[in-house]
UniProtKB/Swiss-Prot annotation:
SUPFAM superfamilies: FMT C-terminal domain-like, Formyltransferase. It comes from Escherichia coli O6:H1 (strain CFT073 / ATCC 700928 / UPEC). One of its GO terms (molecular function) is methionyl-tRNA formyltransferase activity. (6S)-5,6,7,8-tetrahydrofolate binds at residues 113-116. One of its GO terms (cellular component) is cytosol. The gene is fmt. It is an enzyme of class 2 (transferase). Composed of an N- and a C-terminal domain. The N-terminal domain carries the tetrahydrofolate (THF)-binding site and the C-terminal domain is presumably involved in positioning the Met-tRNA substrate for the formylation reaction. HAMAP family: Formyl_trans. This is Methionyl-tRNA formyltransferase. The keyword Chaperone does not apply. It catalyses: L-methionyl-tRNA(fMet) + (6R)-10-formyltetrahydrofolate = N-formyl-L-methionyl-tRNA(fMet) + (6S)-5,6,7,8-tetrahydrofolate + H(+). Belongs to the Fmt family. Residues 2-189 are annotated as: N-terminal domain.
Length: 315
């Protein structure tokens, strides 16, 4: 067995909690957990703890929830824990240079892409949107840049034609802990081999916006189908009908050319709602009107056929 490391864990969402759970059964010593402050959630806007906090408190671990790690007293809390390494997974706060240098082995991060491709906030969604054939996780040594540190370990997985951001998230939440445990063993043994990122291969995964998820019919059917999968389950691709936002959960590409203007409804039947795009035809299969549950197109046509008259154009 490798040396047992003193670890500070910093993370916030469920993705991070799955990594903490793996660490708890790895034989290492978790000396402290940092997570974001409780946030208002749900209809009642009640303050809710992060998934990482819930798990940490359940396991009796000391939890710290600073708003920032810039104040000296918060940095001192990190120093007082005398960690060998700090593991950061979707924490959501910037780590100042002083904090990065505190642990003996520095700070390492689990990132949801095969760096240097897709540095930034939304790597899972951007890899789908771009039509990448594969993605994965990279365990990297953190520095002051945005996902610019040396790479310590990578694990890859294929992106299938059915994958959404939700399914890919689950796949990477399985891969990440595997890569993390292996990397910690290598750090403890002194066998880690840091690899500098090739700056010529860098792409950036910009944060998502709801407006970006609005369907632009001038794009190709293939691009729109990828967009629908990339933005599922958040923020969800959508279009506007009679002033109402209607979410699109699933669609397929019909490999046929059409001279109709982008956004023109070509057919509306139980096989789908076929719409002309900038290149090809998009077949809408599952949609969700405002205030309703997601439903098949057949059910939607039973209640709202007037929305989808062939020849009409969708906004």
């Amino acid at each position: 067995m490798s040396e047992s490391l003193r670890i500070i864990f910093a993370g916030t969402p469920d993705f991070a909690a799955r990594h903490l759970d793996a660490l708890l059964s790895s034989g290492h010593n978790i000396v402290g957990v940092f997570t974001q402050p409780d946030r208002p959630a749900g209809r009642g806007k009640k303050l809710m703890p992060s998934p990482v906090k819930v798990l940490a408190e359940d396991k009796g671990l000391p939890v710290f929830q600073p708003v920032s790690l810039r104040p000296q007293e918060n940095q001192q809390r990190v120093a007082d824990l005398q960690a060998d390494v700090m593991v950061v997974v979707a924490y959501g706060l910037i780590l100042p240079k002083a904090v990065l240098e505190m642990p003996r082995l520095g700070c390492i991060n689990v990132h949801g892409s095969l760096l240097p491709r897709w540095r930034g906030a939304a790597p899972i969604q951007r890899s789908l949107w771009a039509g990448d054939a594969e993605t994965g996780v990279t365990i990297m040594q953190m520095d002051v840049g945005l996902d610019t540190g040396d790479m310590l370990y990578k694990l890859s997985c294929p992106i299938t034609a059915e994958d959404t951001s939700g399914t890919l998230y689950d796949k990477l939440a399985e891969l990440g802990p595997q890569g993390l445990i292996t990397t910690l063993k290598q750090l403890a043994d002194g066998t880690a081999k840091p690899e500098v990122q090739d700056e010529t291969l860098v792409t950036y995964a910009e944060k998502l916006s709801k407006e970006e998820a609005r369907i632009d019919w001038s794009l190709s059917a293939a691009q729109l189908e990828r967009c629908i999968r990339a933005f599922n389950p958040w923020p969800m691709s959508w279009l506007e009908i009679e002033g109402q936002p209607v979410k699109v959960w699933k669609a397929s590409v019909i490999d046929t050319t059409t001279k109709a203007a982008p956004g023109t409804i070509l057919e509306a039947n139980k096989q789908g709602i076929q719409v002309a795009t900038g290149d090809g035809i998009l077949n809408l299969l599952s949609m969700q009107p405002a205030g309703k549950k997601a439903m098949s197109v057949q059910d939607l046509l039973n209640s709202r056929r007037e929305w989808f008259v062939p020849g009409n154009r969708l906004a």
